[in-house]
């Protein structure tokens, strides 16, 4: 590590430098209202959190983000996200300090002395590697991801801080150059959104996915967003009526019933329209109603009542209560026909299931779940241990990261044309699929393909981030048959 001597002591709040930017104008970094909320919660050590903020603000003084904002606004924003998740003192302190070792003269030993080994582990886990002799940006990225996963294996809060860090960076990605927007969006879809899903942190997962799609395929994003906006306007009265009807049936016989509604996320629609080839009108869960009740028995009773009220669609019922998802998600899902034959999804769960569904692993800290919460954490992290055990045989970081991406992979990949346009395909798609995704005429005249500049067989399975060039004949009908079983689209 480079020499980081002569480090000044952590400044007290009263010793903070004047609130100035490069133009010497006062600025609000958002800490004051955030700290006021912290002080209302007795479980937080406000003195330690304020001390961490004071160090971060002093250390980042004179540093600015691409937006022109003082850098301190970023760690404060990350800490706010973690506070909203209900994370603990160490996690919030780690968030405030997460870039201090990477970008300032302070080292990890100093963090250990001032804030303890637990915070130091979290900060070190999200700190990128220093100057090491690596030849490519891909190697640097791979080494950083490996370092993060190793730390995550010791303390899952490392990745929770990193998810919040990535979320705020994606929220402000409009200030990045286009190449970085694309690179970080791909990484977000390949690594960070799937991790959020595995950990059950739904809100972060969905926002990361939507932001990544916005930068990877802005045309598709805007088209879906426009359609969803119309659906939201059309469905406002419809959903209000549905909720009123269900409430009238359930509230007289059940206590603590909550009924809410939502319109599906952009990425959720994107996967069905652009990956699975469905028409917008064929998506049955654009509208959804959520019913939260006190007990598991109430869940099944509520299911029977809504099936009496509305016609259930065959094959659309899923019992994730008796068979939870791998990320411990539990709910009953059913799709029914409402007034006017409009389909909508109903999700039914208990309050405990709802906390787990919304906050995932973070619910352990937010709701102090005790031993049961610890068991839930162990179950959720089993995949990390297995993944790292499998990766121990990898000869280098890039091999390990390929294994990680493969383990996390969803059912979609993103492949580029030589001009930089992006095509979204199902996982396992071949270059034939890519050709037909461009246009049927291209697929019909296809004679071969290059991936990353090298000739590949037409059965080659594409991977996210690759550049595919389709080679064609001037004569139509010379390409591979679209009836080939290889075709995924």
Feature-to-residue mapping (PLM):
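Short, contiguous pre-domain boundary segments
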Residues: 13-42
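Active-site flanking loop/helix segments enriched in acidic
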Residues: 53-81, 130-148, 419
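Alpha-helical phosphate/pyrophosphate-handling elements in metalloenzyme active cores
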Residues: 51, 61-95, 101-110
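Internal insertion modules embedded within essential enzymes
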Residues: 9, 26-31, 48, 108, ...
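Short hydrophobic/aromatic beta-strand micro-patches
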Residues: 292-294
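N-terminal acidic, proline/glycine-rich, low-complexity intrinsically disordered segments
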Residues: 1-15
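Short, mixed-charge amphipathic alpha-helical segments
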Residues: 37-52, 107-119
């Amino acid at each position: 590590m480079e020499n980081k001597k002569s480090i000044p002591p952590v400044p007290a709040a009263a010793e903070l430098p004047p609130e100035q930017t490069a133009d010497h104008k006062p600025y609000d970094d958002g800490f004051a209202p955030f700290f006021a909320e912290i002080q209302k919660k007795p479980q937080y050590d406000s003195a330690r959190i304020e001390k961490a903020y004071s160090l971060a603000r002093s250390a980042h003084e004179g540093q600015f983000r691409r937006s022109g904002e003082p850098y301190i606004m970023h760690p404060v924003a990350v800490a706010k996200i973690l506070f909203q998740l209900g994370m603990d003192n160490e996690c919030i302190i780690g968030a405030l300090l997460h870039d201090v070792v990477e970008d300032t003269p302070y080292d990890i030993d100093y963090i250990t002395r001032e804030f303890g080994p637990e915070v130091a582990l979290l900060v070190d886990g999200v700190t990128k590697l220093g100057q090491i002799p690596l030849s490519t940006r891909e190697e640097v990225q791979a080494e950083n991801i490996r370092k993060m996963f190793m730390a995550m294996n010791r303390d899952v809060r490392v990745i929770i801080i990193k998810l919040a860090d990535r979320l705020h960076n994606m929220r402000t990605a409009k200030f990045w150059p286009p190449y970085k927007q694309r690179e970080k969006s791909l990484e977000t879809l390949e690594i960070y959104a799937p991790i959020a899903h595995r950990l059950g942190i739904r809100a972060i997962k969905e926002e990361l996915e939507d932001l990544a799609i916005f930068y990877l395929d802005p045309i598709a994003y805007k088209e879906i967003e426009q359609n969803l906006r119309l659906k939201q306007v059309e469905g406002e009265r419809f959903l209000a009526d549905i909720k009123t009807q269900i409430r009238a049936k359930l509230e007289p016989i059940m206590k603590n019933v909550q009924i809410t509604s939502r319109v599906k996320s952009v990425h959720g629609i994107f996967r069905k329209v652009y990956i699975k080839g469905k028409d917008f009108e064929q998506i049955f869960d654009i509208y959804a109603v959520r019913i939260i009740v006190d007990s598991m028995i109430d869940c099944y009773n509520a299911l029977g009542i809504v099936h009496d009220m509305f016609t259930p669609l065959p094959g659309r019922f899923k019992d994730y209560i008796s068979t939870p998802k791998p990320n411990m998600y539990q709910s009953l899902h059913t799709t029914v026909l409402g007034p006017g034959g409009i389909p909508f999804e109903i999700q039914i769960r208990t309050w405990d299931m709802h906390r787990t569904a919304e906050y995932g692993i973070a619910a352990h800290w937010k709701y102090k779940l005790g031993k049961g919460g610890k068991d839930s954490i162990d179950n959720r992290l089993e995949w990390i241990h297995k993944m790292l055990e499998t990766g121990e045989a990898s000869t280098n970081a890039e091999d390990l990261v390929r294994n990680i991406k493969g383990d996390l992979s969803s059912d979609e990949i993103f492949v580029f044309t030589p001009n930089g346009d992006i095509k979204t395909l199902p996982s396992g798609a071949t270059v034939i699929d890519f050709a037909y995704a461009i246009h049927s005429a291209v697929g019909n005249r296809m004679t071969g393909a290059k991936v990353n500049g090298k000739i590949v067989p037409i059965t080659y399975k594409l991977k996210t981030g690759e550049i595919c060039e389709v080679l064609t004949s001037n004569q139509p009908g010379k390409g591979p048959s679209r009836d080939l079983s290889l075709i995924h689209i």
